UniProtKB/Swiss-Prot annotation:
Keywords: Ribonucleoprotein, Ribosomal protein, RNA-binding, rRNA-binding, tRNA-binding. The keyword S-adenosyl-L-methionine does not apply. It comes from Aquifex pyrophilus. This is Large ribosomal subunit protein uL16. The gene is rplP. The keyword tRNA-binding applies. GO terms for molecular function: rRNA binding; structural constituent of ribosome; tRNA binding. Belongs to the universal ribosomal protein uL16 family.
């Protein structure tokens, strides 16, 4: 069995781009995968400010 390919994150999201709660969100400036550690770092920075 071969390892599944991760693929390429393409274009802009048309679903799931509304804030569910809170006042702040992050927006990507380029196409790339984002890790859980990066998301957590942003969350901590927002909580501290």
């Amino acid at each position: 069995m071969e390892k599944a390919e991760k693929g390429n994150p393409k274009g802009k999201a048309f679903r799931g781009n509304k804030l569910a709660f809170g006042e702040y969100g992050i927006q990507a400036l380029d196409r790339a995968w984002i890790t859980q550690q990066q998301i957590e770092a942003v969350r901590v920075a927002l909580v501290r400010s």
